């Protein structure tokens, strides 16, 4: 088990710099034999301010190298107050980044670009904005997403329409320079909400003639909310949903995911931003805020179900097998399964007692008063995660969260889960592709250990296998690009 760092909550196998603020993943692209992951980053402080594009790259999704800051605000320029979110493409031997240029006092963030001919180390910004003005009847405008389809370049831009609906606006181009606005690619329903909603960070994945549109719901009053996925088909420049929208992630701490089209045919990868779930004062003491999720594979089943699973490459991070237990429990007292590290990968099959709940408890204090509970509830047909006792520090946020699990309602049906825990983040995946992401902040003494528990009069059964994860493949050095030095301000 690797020696924990000074900060026991800093993730070991999730991407983020060693300190300071990060938020949205950006510019996911495979270029020159590497996966490139950019992200919103304040290199100088812990606030969402002075936003740059940070940069990691990897040849294999296992070994990561942090590169110098890619994009920095230009003092006095169109992006003086932040290089906000967007994406990147690999074209003609170069990286071309599309991003939102932020200036205080301008309600929209125009689309602009920067290009790199050396794999993302040095960047040249275009001298003027690519799309300087938003269309009429919009009240929010940011976050371009560009892809190539049928020989044409296409762009979605996140927006809010004047009538209160969120929308992804469509543009098209033959040359990446001249873009024609085609109107809303897709928009929300007025009946879905009484409050105005904007769609941030639209992403679009194609699976044959079917499409998956991912949007991040944002409200003027509360800001970032949650991520919604729409499935359907495109017809004459408009996306037609074939099913009601659903949440992409059922946890409280997941937002603004970004897609990467992998070099393999039909394979899509996704990273999200997992924000802090603790008081700002604690994050400021720690010196960092936010992390990216693990890379996930995004799939679309024949029945239209969107699924997510950890990228297959992550199996290579597994090191020592920590435990392998099988059994049934019919007593109110939990069964001790064994110790785990603070960064581990677990697979389990749970067959719940149909008259109660059956699950696992991650105990993080010697006296057992600090724990994270994960339970199957057959009556509700849901998987529930309770972090109400997951930290003895009152500055950590509590809450109970769940995701649908219809199989739990069928007596005797085993339910397969995969749980990846990395110090202060848990990603919980059903084998059917639903996922719940949350943050928690244990402070208890003693080793972490797992228990199995069941609440009904019958028996709940389990098989659990867990491995320590080796973080040795992430090389993080706090590097700054030269162009960022002249914008060094206290934030």
Where are these regions (language model features)?
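Histidine-centered active-site/metal-ligand motif
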Residues: 14, 36, 55
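Predominantly extracellular/luminal cell-surface or secreted proteins
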Residues: 40, 58, 100, 114-116, ...
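Surface loop/turn signatures of beta-propeller and other carbohydrate-active proteins
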Residues: 1-26, 45-48, 62-90, 120-148, ...
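Beta-propeller blade signature
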Residues: 52-60, 110-119, 168-176, 226-236, ...
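Hydrophobic/aromatic beta-strand elements that line small-molecule binding cavities or substrate pockets
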Residues: 54-55, 86-87, 144, 170, ...
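Beta-rich accessory regions
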Residues: 231-255, 260-491
